[in-house]
C-alpha cells in the first residue's frame, strides 16, 4: 500500500474491473476493494476509537485521507494507506473463512439467502430514507463512483459465508 489510492471518478470507473488482489481462487477487483475500503473507514469512524482519534485531531475526516499521516503507524503511512491495508486484510480473512465454511459444508440459511436476494431492495429503501434517488446514488455516496450493486452484494455474500464458519467455531 504505497502512494495514493485517490483518482477521479472517470479513472475509477475505467479501472473498476481490474484485479488488484488474489488469494487462492479468489480475485478482488478495484470496485470490490472500494466497498471493503469504505466499509473499513466507516467502521473505524463509528467506533469509540475512531471518535477519539477525530476528537483529539489525530484524524481529520474533512481532509483527504491520503494527505494525513496515520497516528497509528510508525512507518509514516497515511490514513488512506492504513485503511487500504486493513481492507485488504479483511477481504483476505473473509475469503479464508468463506473457504472454511465451504470445506465444512456450512451453507447459508433460507433467511440469509433471502437477505442476499433482497440487498437491492434494502438499499433502495435506504436511499429513499436518505432522500437519494437511486441505489446507484447511495452506493456512489457510500463507497465511491466505481462500485456498484454487484460489488456491494459480493461484500455481503462473502461476509455471510465466512460468518457461517466463524460462528460455528
Predicted features along the sequence, with ranges:
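Bacterial signal peptide processing site
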Residues: 1-3
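Acidic, Ser/Thr/Gly/Pro-rich low-complexity segments that form flexible
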Residues: 146, 150-159
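Non-catalytic, conformational "gating/processing" segments within enzyme and secreted inhibitor domains
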Residues: 158-169
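N-terminal targeting/tethering segments
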Residues: 7-149
Amino acid at each position: 500500500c504505497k502512494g495514493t489510492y485517490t483518482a477521479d471518478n472517470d479513472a475509477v470507473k475505467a479501472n473498476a474491473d481490474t484485479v488488484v488482489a488474489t488469494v487462492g481462487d479468489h480475485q478482488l477487483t478495484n470496485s470490490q476493494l472500494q466497498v471493503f475500503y469504505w466499509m473499513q473507514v466507516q467502521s473505524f469512524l463509528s467506533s469509540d476509537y475512531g471518535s477519539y482519534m477525530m476528537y483529539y485531531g489525530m484524524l481529520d475526516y474533512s481532509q483527504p485521507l491520503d494527505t494525513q499521516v496515520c497516528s497509528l503507524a510508525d512507518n509514516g503511512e497515511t490514513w488512506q494507506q492504513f485503511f487500504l491495508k486493513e481492507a485488504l486484510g479483511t477481504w483476505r480473512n473473509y475469503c479464508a473463512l468463506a473457504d472454511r465454511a465451504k470445506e465444512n459444508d456450512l451453507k447459508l440459511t433460507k433467511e440469509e439467502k433471502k437477505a442476499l436476494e433482497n440487498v437491492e431492495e434494502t438499499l433502495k429503501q435506504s436511499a429513499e430514507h436518505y432522500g437519494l434517488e437511486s441505489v446507484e446514488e447511495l452506493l456512489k455516496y457510500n463507497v465511491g463512483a466505481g462500485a456498484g450493486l454487484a460489488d456491494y452484494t459480493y461484500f455481503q455474500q462473502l461476509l455471510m459465508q465466512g460468518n457461517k464458519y466463524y460462528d460455528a467455531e
